[in-house]
Amino acid sequence: MGCGSALPTTRHFATSQVVNLREKLFMIDCGEGAQMQLRRSRLKFSRLNHIFISHLHGDHCFGLLGLISTFGLLGRTADLHIHSPRGLEELFAPMLAFFCKTLTYKVFFHEFETKEPMLIYDDRSVTVPKIRPCLRSRRFSRPCQKDGSCRRHIRPSESSVPRN
């Protein structure tokens, strides 16, 4: 959706990635322009039920309010789950109360502490661990092991891996 440019340009949108696992969409970060890129990609909005915000910088979450509002305009009824570091709900609650009073669905914020590793989300399709920030970059978007090697944020659950 977006390559991660903190300053959106005509060629590069702010951070937002979508992972399609078993026809379920999972969004990682929701920068400005995310809903436009979803439309361009012809991905069904109704299949997106979980959004994961890596950290609380504007270029990672400024697209949320517009996306939530658009879901309401489209008559969405399925719950939307937003997983983020602590503080996002406090930031968005007043804006949702003001701009999205008549939503036809519920938005649930699942916040976590950023200091310790933990399991953020797990179902039969995907496991999403929260890891400590990489000491080299001080970012949560670059997870590193104790030996300095980096690993992926989202990995398929064992049950979702096809067996031969």
Please give the residue ranges for each predicted region.
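Binuclear metal-dependent hydrolase catalytic cores
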Residues: 1-164
